[in-house]
Amino acid sequence: MQRASRLKRELHMLATEPPPGITCWQDKDQMDDLRAQILGGANTPYEKGVFKLEVIIPERYPFEPPQIRFLTPIYHPNIDSAGRICLDVLKLPPKGAWRPSLNIATVLTSIQLLMSEPNPDDPLMADISSEFKYNKPAFLKNARQWTEKHARQKQKADEEEMLDNLPEAGDSRVHNSTQKRKASQLVGIEKKFHPDV
């Protein structure tokens, strides 16, 4: 019972006051199967990437941490190819730092911070960790390429679909109110995908 009421509160908080760059929602109608999305931080190799995560809430939550993994591939020393994350707040003590006072928003914010500040001394991917430590330009290049390939494809496809469905500027249909609405929606989509433009 405590789990269900707490999850309702947390989901409401995530829906009404999400942390910057983070969204989280229920997948289907199951309250314990969530999806999250983290936007890559500015001035990081993940900038403008949209990273999807799976959040599974265990039966003993909040006494056990949520199980979170990346669904979007990411080039990072603390995240392996299966999306598993090496982060202390995702583990119980004594090896971890999970406490029942923490919540899903806090954990997702911690993951967002880990994306900005990798911990090469506690890696899941030794080769990427070594590259991060000893050849940072190569790490940054590879991480940017992975972000471009895996975390930006969907948004590019969405942008292209919207652009393909818009009439030409000289087309008389532009004056149709539906087309005007679509054109204004495109401006909103462009701002969503390119907020600095």
Curated annotation (Swiss-Prot):
Protein name in the entry = Ubiquitin-conjugating enzyme E2 T
* Protein's job: Accepts ubiquitin from the E1 complex and catalyzes its covalent attachment to other proteins. Catalyzes monoubiquitination. Involved in mitomycin-C (MMC)-induced DNA repair. Acts as a specific E2 ubiquitin-conjugating enzyme for the Fanconi anemia complex by associating with E3 ubiquitin-protein ligase FANCL and catalyzing monoubiquitination of FANCD2, a key step in the DNA damage pathway. Also mediates monoubiquitination of FANCL and FANCI. May contribute to ubiquitination and degradation of BRCA1.
Which molecular-function annotations from GO does this UniProt entry contain? ATP binding; chromatin binding; ubiquitin conjugating enzyme activity; ubiquitin protein ligase binding; ubiquitin-protein transferase activity
This entry carries the following GO cellular component terms, namely: nucleolus; nucleoplasm; nucleus
- What disease is recorded for this protein? Fanconi anemia complementation group T: A disorder affecting all bone marrow elements and resulting in anemia, leukopenia and thrombopenia. It is associated with cardiac, renal and limb malformations, dermal pigmentary changes, and a predisposition to the development of malignancies. At the cellular level it is associated with hypersensitivity to DNA-damaging agents, chromosomal instability (increased chromosome breakage) and defective DNA repair.
- Reactions catalysed according to its record: S-ubiquitinyl-[E1 ubiquitin-activating enzyme]-L-cysteine + [E2 ubiquitin-conjugating enzyme]-L-cysteine = [E1 ubiquitin-activating enzyme]-L-cysteine + S-ubiquitinyl-[E2 ubiquitin-conjugating enzyme]-L-cysteine
Glycyl lysine isopeptide (Lys-Gly) (interchain with G-Cter in ubiquitin): where is this cross-link? 91, 182
Q: What induces it?
A: Down-regulated following hypoxia. Up-regulated in breast cancers.
> What are the UBC core domain coordinates in residue numbering?
2-152
Keyword list (alphabetical) reads: ATP-binding, Disease variant, DNA damage, DNA repair, Fanconi anemia, Isopeptide bond, Nucleotide-binding, Nucleus, Phosphoprotein, Transferase, Ubl conjugation, Ubl conjugation pathway
**Residue location of crosslink Glycyl lysine isopeptide (Lys-Gly) (interchain with G-Cter in SUMO2):** 191-192
Checking CDD domains in the record gives: UBCc_UBE2T
Q: Which organism is it from?
A: Homo sapiens
Outcome of mutating residue 2 to E: In FANCT; abolishes FANCD2 monoubiquitination; abolishes interaction with FANCL
Q: Which family does it belong to?
A: Belongs to the ubiquitin-conjugating enzyme family.
InterPro entries found in the cross-reference section:
Ub_conjugating_enzyme (IPR050113), UBQ-conjugat_E2_core (IPR000608), UBQ-conjugating_AS (IPR023313), UBQ-conjugating_enzyme/RWD (IPR016135)
Q: How does it assemble?
A: Directly interacts with FANCL. Interacts with BRCA1.
Where Phosphoserine occurs, residue numbers? 184
